[in-house]
């Protein structure tokens, strides 16, 4: 992601004053106006914390660490900092989420459409599963459908697990160099409705991350895609 973000940033007239790769010590140039973090689940929290403690606005798209999000929010409030987080910076994914949420809202009043399942496909280098985007979309569904209150995930060719009536099943696949595919199936005994978003590359994610960085300038607090795009 770093190379894609750098290309987009340069194309929009920005200067990249530092690059930190995996295993390198985190040193942030005083010339920095914002830090963009796309790292790993085990390093993201410390990266974000160090940047915020240094007084730098932070944009993060790293997934798999958000059980500590409350600590980051408290730090942002305490230091009057700025933090923008999204599990997926694609504008198309945000549109997809909006469509899924509206479909779930409609189907909550149609008991025959009570069967919802999800599938996400990513490249073999993605360490966490289900994807952060899949969990976010699942949260959208849970917020609109009374039937569901929890999720259950399984990976690849593992045996399909049994699920409780209130559990939304997510199937995660890791294949080749797939940038990202998310599918939602809403079914009845008579038919099924499928919604899908497929990314063709990393450019859309990179553009969203740079847009978020631009949006964050001069602001204080915690923000997400809904704050920047105002689709609701």
What are these regions, as identified by a protein language model?
Residues 90-91, 104, 123-127:
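Short beta-strand and adjoining strand-loop segment in the mid-core
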Residues 41-42, 64-65, 88-89, 175:
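Short glycine-rich anion-binding loops that position phosphate/pyrophosphate groups of nucleotides
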Residues 2-32, 112-232:
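C-terminal substrate-binding/catalytic lobe of Rossmann-fold NAD(P)-dependent oxidoreductases
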């Amino acid at each position: 992601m770093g190379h894609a973000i750098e290309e987009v940033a340069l194309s929009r007239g920005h200067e990249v004053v530092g690059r930190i790769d995996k295993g390198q010590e985190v040193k942030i140039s005083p010339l920095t106006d914002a830090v963009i973090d796309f790292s790993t689940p085990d390093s993201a929290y410390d990266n974000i914390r160090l940047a915020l403690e240094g007084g730098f606005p932070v944009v993060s798209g790293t997934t798999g660490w958000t059980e500590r999000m409350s600590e980051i929010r408290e730090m942002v409030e305490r230091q009057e900092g700025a933090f923008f987080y999204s599990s997926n910076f694609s504008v198309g994914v945000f549109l997809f989420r909006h469509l899924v949420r509206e479909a779930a809202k409609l189907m909550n009043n149609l008991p025959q459409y009570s069967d919802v399942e999800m599938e996400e496909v990513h490249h073999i280098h993605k360490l966490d599963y289900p994807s952060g985007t899949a969990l976010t979309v699942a949260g959208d569904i849970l917020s609109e459908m009374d039937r569901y209150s929890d999720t259950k995930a399984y990976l690849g060719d593992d045996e399909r697990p049994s699920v409780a009536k209130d559990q939304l099943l997510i199937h995660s696949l890791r294949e080749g160099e797939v940038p990202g595919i998310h599918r939602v199936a809403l079914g009845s005994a008579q038919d099924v409705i499928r919604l899908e978003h497929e990314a063709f590359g990393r450019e859309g994610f990179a553009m969203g991350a740079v847009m978020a960085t631009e949006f964050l300038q001069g602001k204080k607090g915690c923000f997400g895609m809904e704050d920047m795009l105002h689709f609701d």
